[in-house]
């Protein structure tokens, strides 16, 4: 018996604040395949010359994306974003881990959001 989709799309979110690692686990649905739009965001503020920030996104234990960049916009914030889509077969969870680094920059916010479409 096939289970109907919920009346509202699933939304999952983790806000790690100024933490350096965020983990979002979307639990499995035993009956249906789901599709998610996923956004990962790091916000930093430069503390001095040579400031840099980096973000690595791992999905189910494998590298999905990584980037390092100079931190710009002195006196304000700078950010790094990664957006991707993932099909989640019935019975399978999805684990997203975002790891960050900051040199001469302060982490302000680390966020992962997933919305079913």
Regions found by a protein language model. Give the residues of each.
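A short beta-turn/strand-edge loop motif at beta-sheet boundaries
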Residues: 31-34, 46-51, 104
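Short beta-strand-to-coil "C-cap" segments at the C-terminal boundary of structured domains/repeats
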Residues: 111-117
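Short beta-strands within extracellular/lumenal beta-sheet-rich domains
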Residues: 15-30, 76-84
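Short edge beta-strand/loop segments characteristic of extracellular beta-sandwich folds
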Residues: 27, 39-45
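Noncatalytic modules at the cell exterior or secretory-pathway interfaces
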Residues: 33-38, 85-109
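Terminal beta-strand-rich extracellular "head" domains
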Residues: 43-83
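Transition segment at domain starts
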Residues: 1-23
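Short beta-strand segments enriched in hydrophobic/aromatic residues
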Residues: 42-44, 98-100, 114
């Amino acid at each position: 018996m096939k289970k109907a989709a919920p009346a509202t799309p699933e939304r999952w979110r983790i806000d790690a604040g100024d933490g350096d690692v965020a983990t979002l686990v979307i639990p499995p649905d035993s009956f249906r395949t789901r599709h998610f739009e996923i956004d990962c965001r790091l916000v930093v503020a430069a503390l001095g010359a040579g400031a840099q920030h980096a973000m690595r996104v791992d999905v189910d234990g494998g590298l999905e994306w990584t980037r390092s960049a100079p931190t710009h916009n002195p006196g304000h914030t700078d950010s790094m974003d990664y957006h991707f889509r993932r099909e989640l077969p019935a019975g399978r969870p999805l684990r997203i881990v975002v790891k960050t680094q900051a040199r001469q920059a302060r982490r302000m916010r680390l966020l992962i959001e997933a919305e079913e479409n």
